[in-house]
């Protein structure tokens, strides 16, 4: 095994051989997120090459201005992912997201989404034993990809129906870390089936000991905290009310809380509760120790076929679940996929998530991952998430997104509307077939938007060897386990930031409280 990578194939399918040394791979350039500023220093951005560094870490022969990386070394067939250099170090300065501008230079107007109605559809996750769409547990380090990491407890349980808190709840007494872990996530979800999740005003600052800052952004930061009651570690996202209002993020912030309050799934991050004071909003979430899939992908350059399949399968189950609840996610990308300490994925950042039963027109997302109907300002539905899954699979297999060309975001949009994708010869035939049916502008042919819905994706031949029930219950060993110690607040995978808590808990007039009545 290559010691500093440690990625194993979770499936029996052989890894397709890599291209010859003459084959070139492109390194994705940074692209802005539309419409929503990030609350994390690196979230919602494609990686930037530091102009002060003359070489890309994994390919010494390439300068930062180059659009290609020459001489990618081959992947070990069947089992291992190569290490092609040290982990790419992200720039620590804040990188605020930007919005699309029209030809006149003015930001596009956000059109309100349609009224919503409850969904009657059931996801495959639910049919395999997970909670129905009425379950009201939540998840997120929303908007803070570098800030979130796997839960310090497994599994994370919601508050029980009878009002008795489960062992992992922040307000309960200390428990043995190894106790209570024999239950599968499916069993946990079944137990939560009729639970009512109330998050408003559940905690106060006095319930937690603040440990350190995990990430910062344009209108907030995320802290690692320890519950004074059960001594477990959590992530508390703090948003400054004045900044949220100033940057016109009130609707997205409230949507994020609402979506996370409703969802409960093994591959979605959990929101335990919210509270506020005169100056700030607080969201108590799982602490996900393992970091972003983005970092692992950049370190490895690209994944073998079975490794990409494992992560894509977990994402597909999460999307299937969200869609059964009429929730469109709209911001799928490696930066928003976090690895828990066991190596399973957690989707975070629900700032763009929206409950939409039919179509919506809101322009939001990351340029590389936008579907053509979004770029063209047409009404769109849940199928945009399946398009994004195709882009994600392509990036995991190739190391770059299909419509990136090193130019401006507008050039990316032109490429998306043009719709021409060049598939490298080393992509597995089944994977290529799936991608061609996901990354298609024709909605009558896009998988996930057809008669059988998400099942047309899950039953595709590329996923043939996936046991979905075992995957949902986390019985399939992940290909990579992050080098962190669980249960002790190990934040070694996060950069250090100057601490700032002086504005927390101060009394005074609450000028913006009426915007956030549900916190």
From Swiss-Prot:
Residue positions binding ATP: 214-222, 237
GO CC entries: cAMP-dependent protein kinase complex; cytosol; fungal-type vacuole; nucleoplasm
Domain (Protein kinase) ranges: 208-463
SMART domains: S_TK_X (SM00133), S_TKc (SM00220)
BP GO annotations: adenylate cyclase-activating glucose-activated G protein-coupled receptor signaling pathway; negative regulation of gluconeogenesis; negative regulation of induction of conjugation with cellular fusion; negative regulation of transcription by RNA polymerase II; positive regulation of protein export from nucleus
Ways its activity is controlled: Activated by cAMP.
Chemical reaction(s) catalysed: L-seryl-[protein] + ATP = O-phospho-L-seryl-[protein] + ADP + H(+); L-threonyl-[protein] + ATP = O-phospho-L-threonyl-[protein] + ADP + H(+)
One GO MF term attached to the UniProt entry: ATP binding
Domain AGC-kinase C-terminal: 464-519
Positions of the UniProt region annotated as Disordered: 1-195
Organism domain of life: Eukaryota
EC number: 2.7.11.11
Coiled coil: none
Changes seen on gene knockout: Abolishes nematode trap development following exposure to C.elegans. Decreases growth on rich medium and leads to a conidation defect with only 1 or 2 conidia per conidiophore.
Compositional bias (Polar residues): 10-25, 116-159, 173-191
Keyword Oxidoreductase applies: no
The family this protein is said to belong to: Belongs to the protein kinase superfamily. Ser/Thr protein kinase family.
Function (record text): Functions downstream of adenylate cyclase to regulate trap-development for nematode capture.
Name used for this protein in its record: cAMP-dependent protein kinase catalytic subunit
Organism for this UniProt entry: Arthrobotrys oligospora (strain ATCC 24927 / CBS 115.81 / DSM 1491)
Biological classification of the source: Eukaryota, Fungi, Dikarya, Ascomycota, Pezizomycotina
